[in-house]
Every structure is written in structure tokens, then in C-alpha cells.
Amino acid sequence: NFGLTENGKYYEKLNYAIGEGIEPGSTFKLIAIAAALEDQVIDTIQKVDTSGGILDFYGYKVRDSRKGGYGKINVMDAIRLSSNTGVVKIIDSVYNKKSKKFVDRLYNFGIAKPVISSIKGEPKPKIPHPDDESWNGLSLPWMTYGYGVKMTPIQILTFYNSIANEGE
């Protein structure tokens, strides 16, 4: 990514793929579902009701992009359709009282560590933990679809590559 100098010349300012953490949003849904599958607390054909496309958590809404939601769908469709309500309901149903187990699984996946040690400037991912002072009732549902989390694009890509390469 290039910046522009006062003289009108371009220079490489920052490699955003490794240099800046972002909230991964919907790309984190697969990571959340992978944690539940790995913990064997769900299976891919399990059904979830998307609740008309809106869920309420402590007065805050989780919404699907599709008005009215998707009805009853299975876990695979929740990922395929990128259903916020579906994925949040699935994860909340199995980890609501065990959020530490969920986050520990994420840490076990290695996503809380930088991936490219040979390149300077890669920030450490921010994966909230129930022991953090800032953890609250919204932390788990928001994390489920990538909010409150910070990862660089290369860190997200590395996780997806491990799935594509069957865990390697």
C-alpha cells in the first residue's frame, strides 16, 4: 500500500496484510464454528433457528443481512449464508457458561500469536479472554462474528489455509 509524499511521489507506507490488525468480521465465523466442532459440542447437521434475523443481547441487536433471517438452517448453512444470528446462537448455546473453554480453544488453534516471525511489524492478534477486565456479556456473541477481535489479514488467511490443508 502506497502513501503520497508532499512532492507527489509514492512510497510504500505500510504492508496492511501484515502490519495492521483489523476486526475480521464475518471471516471469524468459521474460526468460531471450527472451535465448537473441534470441541465436539456441535456437528455440521445440527439445526439452528435464525430467530427472524434478529437476536437481542443486553439491549444490543445481532442482525442478519437478510431481512427476516434464514429460518431453520444447519451449521454448514449458517457458515455458507454468513448468518450472524445462526452462528451467534450456535456458539452461545454451547459456550455461554463456558466462554473460557471457547477462548482457550481459539488460543489452542494458535490464532493469538503472530504468524510471520521473520517480518518485523506484525502485531500480536487481540483475542479477548474471559479473565480480561473488559470481558462482559457481549464479548462472546460479538467475538463469534469477529468483533472485539483484531487480526491482520495474513493471520486470518493462515487459519483458512490450515483448514484448506486439512489442519497443516
Question: Can you name each region flagged by the protein language model?
Answer:
Residues N1-G25, I31-E168:
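Beta-lactam-recognizing serine transpeptidase/beta-lactamase-like catalytic domain environment
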